[in-house]
UniProtKB/Swiss-Prot annotation:
The name this protein goes by in its record: DNA topoisomerase 4 subunit B
Positions annotated to bind Mg(2+) 2: D502, D504
EC category name: isomerase
Species in which this protein is naturally found: Mycoplasma pneumoniae (strain ATCC 29342 / M129 / Subtype 1) (Mycoplasmoides pneumoniae)
Keywords carried by this UniProt record: ATP-binding, DNA-binding, Isomerase, Magnesium, Metal-binding, Nucleotide-binding, Topoisomerase
GO biological process: DNA topological change
The reaction(s) this protein catalyses: ATP-dependent breakage, passage and rejoining of double-stranded DNA
Cofactor remark from the record: Binds two Mg(2+) per subunit. The magnesium ions form salt bridges with both the protein and the DNA. Can also accept other divalent metal cations, such as Mn(2+) or Ca(2+).
NCBIfam families found in the cross-reference section: parE_Gpos, PRK05644.1
Binding site for Mg(2+) 1: E428, D502
Quaternary structure (record): Heterotetramer composed of ParC and ParE.
Top-level taxon of origin: Bacteria
Length: 635
């Protein structure tokens, strides 16, 4: 490092250069979530027009070559020359950071876009972007390239009908910023469907030109009540839905929640239509208010005696499913960072508290049968938690005798003392487990073979059954975080937990059993990106040169067959068919292996998949595995 630190070392990033230099500061990451975030930003700008009452249709079209168009029938971006920038307002919005109508309290009373930087950030991180505006009987267009450089400044390209208005943005993420760009049509559908739930009678359309090309329409009459019905579709409801709505101090709240027969809490929250996946002030106030109402009601009607403790938050949250939607004035809305995953606005707390307590207490007073069923469930939760005291010991380290006894002879630990370096391979069977133990990097990689049958946790009644299953209990001890409400992610003993199974139907079934367990009892491991699937090769290919090549797909095999006239092909039926060196080289070596990181991008879709995977209908599970997982067959 040079010691001559002077004014020459200080760089001033002009225009959109700051975004290009540090894209993660603005969109969170440059992986698939990053380029999808660009789409969400443009979509959020359309939604802002809906929130303000100026638009009722939004259209998304996915084109070839990773181009995508988002249109609305809102007011349209003004095209007149801006007084400060001295260029068209369209070009100002798309080439200046912190330029937009959201800094003017009159233009957008409520908005969810990225505080005036969304459009320009998308432009900065796209290699092509085109804006078309219909407004005041004119059609204007601007074209940009190479990260926001003006190719064609805003200019009139024709006339529009006087009642035609709106904005259309077509862009392509910059391949120099994002690797392996591929828009996920299912993810886009899920977001459009979510918006249809959030805004009654808003029409959203989607056309996937890379697929069927058919127009899909998303529209609801009942809004978030319909959303909760879908969330609870496969659950047994304890009581009817509870509705909360009202406006205080220009803050609008709409919420619907329901208690179901289950142990998980499923609470989805939104602020100005933005999904706040990490919660925030609105979610915290809602939870606190629900708990206060329940305890006050139980005291008033003597369900809780004087000697009884109040219900704890963790007891109340088990089986509580709900949707919370708040709309806040732009002047007070505050998110954590630019990606808006957590709401910080303090003003929302009192409003949510007042309205939730009022409506929920009225519901309990007016619906005594439902109230009694809810209270009975809470007492059941309390009784179950008392029976699960042994589970609290799971969070303790592996020095306790029970853990040592359970793990003895099973776990081959990693030697590194640093959690960030350690990997745990959860391996199907003793045979593959033994090979993995011989082939691994002993310093960084731990091996845990699964010897018995993994429990399908979707078919059990409570956590007690999960921790009585030896294979799951071993896994719980090994990971070290605890489960359910006693889960603490900072106690994890590994940074990567890698499921390594055979590439066949049985292997896929074991993967799904384990993923179901992680989803139900250790969900933050998935949310924080710590769960992976190993991808062992399907084939070993040797040509005339006798050099071994490992192939992962049927397509790769066909390509090699076309290039070689003489060859031998071995189809790996299981991990145990590879020796230790081969398993290391193909599946475990961080420099050469292929891993799939398990992600949770859509809550309801995940719920539905889990129910397909692990519910009572085995024919659904079998057909899904056969349709969606390609194991390739021997020829």
């Amino acid at each position: 490092m040079k010691n001559n630190y002077s004014e020459a070392n200080i760089k001033i990033l002009k225009g959109l250069d700051a975004v290009k230099k540090r894209p993660g500061m603005y969109i969170g990451s440059t992986d698939s979530r990053g380029f999808h975030h660009l789409l969400w930003e443009i979509l959020d700008n359309c939604v802002d027009e809906v929130l303000s009452g100026f638009a009722n249709t939004i259209a998304v079209v996915l084109h070839a070559e990773n181009q995508i168009t988002v249109s609305d029938n809102g007011r349209g971006i003004p095209f007149e020359t801006h007084s400060d920038s001295k260029i068209s307002t369209i070009d100002t919005v798309f080439t200046y950071l912190h330029a937009g109508g959201k800094f003017d309290n009159d233009s957008y009373k409520i908005a969810g876009g990225l505080h005036g930087v969304g459009a320009s950030v998308v432009n900065a991180l796209s290699d092509q972007l085109q804006v078309t505006v219909k407004r005041q009987g004119k059609v204007y267009r601007s074209v940009y390239e190479n990260g926001g450089k003006i190719k064609q400044k805003a200019h009139c390209i024709g006339n529009a009908k006087i009642d035609e208005h709106g904005t259309s943005v077509t862009f392509r993420p910059d391949p120099k910023v994002f690797k392996k760009i591929h828009f996920d049509s299912e993810l886009i559908r899920a977001r459009l469907k979510e918006l249809a739930f959030l805004f009654k009678k808003l029409q959203l359309t989607f056309v996937d030109e890379t697929g069927s090309g058919e127009k899909e329409v998303f529209f609801t009459e009942a809004g978030i009540s319909q959303y909760l019905d879908e969330l609870n579709a496969d659950s047994k409801q304890i009581a009817q839905k509870i509705f909360v709505s009202g406006t205080e101090d220009d803050i609008e709240l709409e919420a619907v929640f329901q208690f179901i027969d289950g142990e998980d809490e499923k609470l989805l929250s939104f602020a100005n239509s933005i999904r706040t996946s990490e919660g925030g002030s609105h979610e915290a106030s809602f939870r606190q208010s629900v708990g206060d109402v329940i305890n006050n009601y139980c005291r008033k009607y003597n369900f809780l005696k004087e000697r009884d403790k109040n219900f704890e938050a963790s007891e109340i949250r088990e089986g509580l499913n709900g949707i919370i939607k708040v709309n806040l004035p732009e002047k007070i809305i505050a998110f954590e960072g630019q990606t808006k995953s957590k709401l910080f606005s303090k003003e929302v707390k009192a409003v949510v508290q007042k309205l939730t307590q009022k409506h929920f207490f009225q519901f309990l007073e007016r619906n005594s049968v439902d109230a009694k069923l809810i209270v009975e469930k809470l007492f059941y939760n309390r009784k179950l938690r008392q029976e699960l005291k042994q589970q609290r010991q799971i969070k303790k380290n592996l020095s306790n005798p029970k853990a040592e006894r359970i793990l003895f002879g099973k776990l081959a630990p990693a030697q590194s003392k640093k959690v960030a370096e350690r990997e745990l391979f959860v391996v199907e069977g003793d045979s593959a487990g033994g090979t993995a133990k011989m082939g691994r990097d002993r310093f960084l990689q731990a091996i845990l073979p699964l010897r018995g049958k993994v429990l399908n946790v979707e078919k059990i009644n409570n956590k007690k059954e999960a921790i009585n299953n030896e294979e799951l209990l071993t896994l719980i001890f090994c990971i070290g975080t605890g489960i359910g409400n006693n889960f603490t992610i900072r106690d994890r003993k590994y940074d990567k937990i890698i499921i390594m199974t055979d590439a066949d139907n049985d292997g896929a079934h074991i993967q799904i059993l384990l993923l179901t367990f992680f989803y139900r009892y250790m969900k933050p491991l998935i949310e924080k990106g710590h769960i992976y699937l190993a991808l062992p090769p399907l084939y070993k290919f040797e040509g005339r040169d006798k050099k071994a090549r490992y192939l992962w797909t049927e397509q790769e095999l066909e390509q090699y067959r076309a290039k070689h006239s003489h060859f031998n092909v071995q189809r790996y039926k299981g991990l145990g068919e590879m020796n230790a060196d081969q398993l290391w080289e193909t599946t475990m070596n961080p420099m050469t292996r292929k891993l799939i990181q398990v992600k949770l991008d859509n809550f309801i879709q995940a719920e539905k998949q889990i129910n397909v995977f692990m519910g009572d209908k085995t024919e659904l599970r079998k057909s899904w595995i056969e349709a969606n997982i390609n194991f390739s067959s021997e020829n």
